[in-house]
Amino acid sequence: MQDKYSPADVEKSAHDHWQATDAYKAVEHAKDKNGKDKKKFYACSMLPYPSGKLHMGHVRNYTINDVMYRYLRMNGYNVLMPMGWDAFGMPAENAAMANNVPPAQWTYANIEHMKTQMASMGLAIDWSREMTACKPEYYKWNQWMFLKMLEKGIIYKKTGSVNWDPIDQTVLANEQVIDGRGWRSGALIEKREIPMYYARITDYAEELLDHVEHKLPGWPERVRTMQANWIGKSTGVRFAFTHDIKDDDKLINDGKLWVFTTRADTIKGVTFCAVAAEHPLATFAAKSNPELAEFIAECKLGSVIEADMATMEKKGMPTGLFVKHPLTGSLVEVWVGNYVLITYGDGAVMGVPAHDERDFAFAQKYVLPIHQVIDVEGKTFSEVTWHDWYADKENGRCINSGKYDGLNYQQAVNTIAADLEELGLGEKKITYRLRDWGISRQRYWGTPIPMINCADCGAVPVPEKDLPVVLPEDCVPDGSGNPLNKHEAFLKCDCPKCGKPARRETDTMDTFVDSSWYYMRYCSPNSNDAMVDSRNDYWMPMDQYIGGIEHAVLHLLYARFWTKVMRDFGLVKFDEPFTNLLTQGMVLNETYYREDASGKKTWFNPADVQLELDDKGRPVSAILNNDRQPVEIGGTEKMSKSKNNGIDPQAQIDQYGADTARLFTMFASPPEQTLEWSGAGVEGANRFLRRVWTYAYNQSARIAAATASDFSKLSDAQKTLRREVHKILQQADNDYKRIQYNTVVSAGMKMLNTLEGAKLDESAASNAVIAEGLSIFLRILNPVAPHITHVLWQELGFAKVHGDILDAAWPQVDAGALEQAEIEMMIQVNGKLRGSIVVAKDADKATIEATALANEAVRKFIEGTPKKIIVVPGKLVNIVA
């Protein structure tokens, strides 16, 4: 055994052993040594995008997963930890353009590099189950599901809004639109309506919402709330304003302007209606109003992102058209509003400025009437300033509303809904904020949509026998549109219906399709004849899913939807894919920058900056190493390329070893909280591991000499050491179960301090106690630092007794070791703590009282005979003087 810790040697030795023994290959129905089925546990991290390099967020995510894997495996579980690649998507196209190589070439090279990095981390990944989203053997099943969903009517085609770049002649993703302009061309972006395929996720809205509330107790409350809000169930009233506006002698929308509201109690307060720029009434009005036409064109340039719509400036313009209020018959002016989405509800909203904050601001901006129809006792309404109580439906009562005056919210809604229904102009309705999932992308690097466009037959599904429709991998995007539109070898085909020449669909699928079911493919690797097979029934549903909070809505919602569709197709037998969810916190680091005269900031990596600290170690100034000139301290932010504050995990591993990187990321913060990077913390983790090695080396002779011992016949010093070791083991085991890995590391540090500080003789019993303590310590530390503990376990001979540490039984707390012959009891005099005593654990009440009264620290607070002595067994003596 080497006397010095060499991470490179240690980690190579461990990696060689794990590779030679195929240590992490998981099999279904694995047996324990008694031939009984082990309990399965499926723990999975959200699959990464193959960007080419791991970042510290990856390291943290995968280490959490790996720690869980190792702890559970030592506890007798059959554990699966797979890995794959979210390999399709826009970043690969952008990189391909920048490097003038096909996305496939760039992607596969990145995957190989990242696999090497993952291997260096010592992750317990079963690589035999690896999946890659851009390989035909995977995306064939995306296409197969598409056809099944199309057949069942779950997938359908309709027009949808997209961001169109008129210079590059291409559709842009939302993130490619910057301040209303194309990221590459700088052109003003237009909203265009084009045919796209959609999945009817709204058909599952109620079930998705119900299961959030009742079937996901192992998910963070924050994520469940985000999902519920995204689904956005609203119970309200859909009703119509009538009109006689005609276009080409035909009533527009049958003479009705439909809206939906959750506040039907305020219907008498309507002073305007707003419609989307694409609404038929807006289109009609613009024909004779050039100014309105120009405004509508401006609205169409705006974002199609709902979040952007919520924060942008609300603008409007009157159409000159009026509709009739269904209950009063009064005329209500119609406006075009840039905040109204044609894709949401009926593309129109009622405006009640007195009781809606957005409408209030809009009415003030354009000097529209404000009519109060809800009153709260003791409050005074003003048209000048908005107050939150204006929208209060809990305490409000109808006023200025005729027959509805005095009704509360629910009474008014029920009565008004009934009246509208009787008029044939409305009814109660449940709506959802959730929209159907548009899965078409006008991009190259994605799963080809398996449809063929025939001049005679229209859109025809590709026959199942012809799957997969293989994406050509030789295209190099140039930013001027989808290269598949020019790829004749891909485009040319015959119509499956009529046999005439036809063209393939060039849209590809949203990459969220790839990530909606990949975790099931891990369970059925290399299944050529089915999307999933019986092995999926063994592993699923997943026991623990791990990933960032940024995926709380879309990915997780789509995966839940996809699972329910697969269930309805008879492919799976469960409702929810992920039993437990852990959303790990972000990794943060300091930021440094310089700002030029134009306000542009240049960011510098923390490794290139030198700090000046005050006497308390706080940074007061910073300079750049290469020019010795000042830089601004920007504060702590998430590690990112844009702020240039990332830390290269590989550099940390090369310098300190993977165990140090793992130990620091687990110790610095609880898994679900943010982690602040600290170079000093990394060095501290490395020093700890060197101490571990040194202690083990120094005890190697004792361990070699250790024999089985009767732990019932120990000296006080030996008992004390065993008690402390088992007490810390108890804490660490509890923390592992709670996924509080930072306090697990704390427990390991505490145990090393305890072992190092023990002063035992050279007896056989002492050797046995130290051997037991060190074997427990190595097993506690193993899930976090698997390399060093694996090698020390082998070197110290524990493997000969217990087998490989990976499968060594988790140490059990010895209740006998925790027992103490003596206990400490606190003493209070008149309710104030005045001292403590040590008595035999089984001391009687009289002995405890006598010992307490004899205590020097207590005697000075007592005069004469105490009035009363209360003994709380094992804890406290309370003396009333």
From Swiss-Prot:
CDD domains: Anticodon_Ia_Leu_BEm (cd07958). The keyword Lipoprotein does not apply. SUPFAM superfamilies: Anticodon-binding domain of a subclass of class I aminoacyl-tRNA synthetases (SSF47323), Nucleotidylyl transferase (SSF52374), ValRS/IleRS/LeuRS editing domain (SSF50677). ATP binds at residue 641. It catalyses: tRNA(Leu) + L-leucine + ATP = L-leucyl-tRNA(Leu) + AMP + diphosphate. A motif ('HIGH' region) lies at residues 48-58. A motif ('KMSKS' region) lies at residues 638-642. One of its GO terms (biological process) is leucyl-tRNA aminoacylation. It comes from the Bacteria. GO terms for cellular component: cytosol. GO terms for molecular function: aminoacyl-tRNA deacylase activity; ATP binding; leucine-tRNA ligase activity. Its main location: cytoplasm. Its EC number is 6.1.1.4. Keywords: Aminoacyl-tRNA synthetase, ATP-binding, Cytoplasm, Ligase, Nucleotide-binding, Protein biosynthesis. It is an enzyme of class 6 (ligase). It is found in: Cytoplasm. Belongs to the class-I aminoacyl-tRNA synthetase family. NCBIfam families: leuS_bact. This is Leucine--tRNA ligase.
